[in-house]
Each structure stands twice: as structure tokens, then as C-alpha cells.
């Protein structure tokens, strides 16, 4: 339990429970993770569509390009910086940018892994579940390796 004075000139005591602080940080962390991942996926998609020429892994996922991966990295770094300034100043900017870069790389690895698993199972697309997004698995593939990262980062960052 943290205590102090909300307005030192009037000596109004306040109490802020650790549960409230923990809940706020958890909300900020989840928001950060989802905004960075969505920014990465969106940036990669639109940059790859507009500028994509060099295939990233043509045998696994022929639609993914190095240009798209670079666009995803730029978008994830931008979302990390915006998240830091908008609502998550508790996470230092260098840590936010480093975490976003790692999340982007893990997102691409998760995407390629999911594509390889689908190719191995001869299930090219599951778009009927979530039309317009390439299917449910295509929306969740970047979470494949980022979910454990979120867990361990939250576990060790605020120790």
C-alpha cells in the first residue's frame, strides 16, 4: 500500500493500493503489446503491397517480402514510441523500442511458422472464420511467439 498526500498544501491523504498500480501497469502492457503487433502487421501488409519486390521466404509464404518486413519494423517502432508518450511512460523509451523490435522479429517468425504448419497440413487458408483478414490464424500468428515474451517480460521487468 502506498500512502502520501494528494495535495500537500491541504494535507489530503491518499491511498493507492498495489493492486491498482499493478492493474494499471498490466493494462498499459497489454495495450502496448497489441498496438505494437497490430502496427507491425498493418505496416508490413501495406508496405509489402506497395513496395514489395524481394521475397522473404518464397517456399513457405510467397506473399511476404523483405520490404514488408522493413515496413512492419518501422510501424512497430512508431507504435512503441507513441505508446510510450501517450499512455505508458513507465516503460523507458529505449526499452520500448528494443521490445518492439524483438516483437516484430518474433511476429515474422511466428507468421512464417504458422504458414509452414498450414502448408504441412495442406490447409492453405482458413478465411471463412474471419473473412477479409486471411483467416483467424493469420490474425493470431504474430502472437505465437510474442505471448511467451509478454509473460516473461511482465514477470521480470517490474521485479
Predicted regions located by residue number:
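Juxtamembrane boundary at the C-terminal end of a transmembrane helix
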Residues: 152-159
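Interhelical loop and helix-boundary elements at the membrane-water interface
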Residues: 1-80, 85-146
Amino acid at each position: 500500500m502506498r500512502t502520501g498526500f494528494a495535495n500537500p498544501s491541504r494535507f489530503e491523504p491518499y491511498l493507492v493500493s498495489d493492486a491498482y498500480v499493478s492493474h494499471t501497469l498490466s493494462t498499459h502492457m497489454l495495450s502496448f503489446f497489441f498496438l505494437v503487433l497490430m502496427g507491425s502487421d498493418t505496416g508490413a501488409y501495406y508496405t509489402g503491397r506497395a513496395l514489395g519486390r524481394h521475397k522473404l521466404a518464397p517456399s513457405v509464404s510467397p506473399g511476404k517480402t523483405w520490404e514488408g518486413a522493413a515496413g512492419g519494423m518501422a510501424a512497430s517502432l512508431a507504435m512503441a514510441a507513441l505508446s510510450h508518450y501517450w499512455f505508458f511512460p513507465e516503460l523507458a523509451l529505449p526499452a520500448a523500442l528494443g521490445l518492439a523490435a524483438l516483437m516484430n522479429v518474433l511476429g515474422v517468425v511466428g507468421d512464417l511458422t504458422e504458414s509452414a504448419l498450414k502448408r504441412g497440413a495442406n490447409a492453405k487458408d482458413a478465411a471463412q472464420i474471419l473473412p477479409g483478414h486471411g483467416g483467424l490464424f493469420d490474425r493470431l500468428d504474430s502472437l505465437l511467439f510474442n505471448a511467451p515474451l509478454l509473460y516473461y517480460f511482465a514477470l521480470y521487468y517490474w521485479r
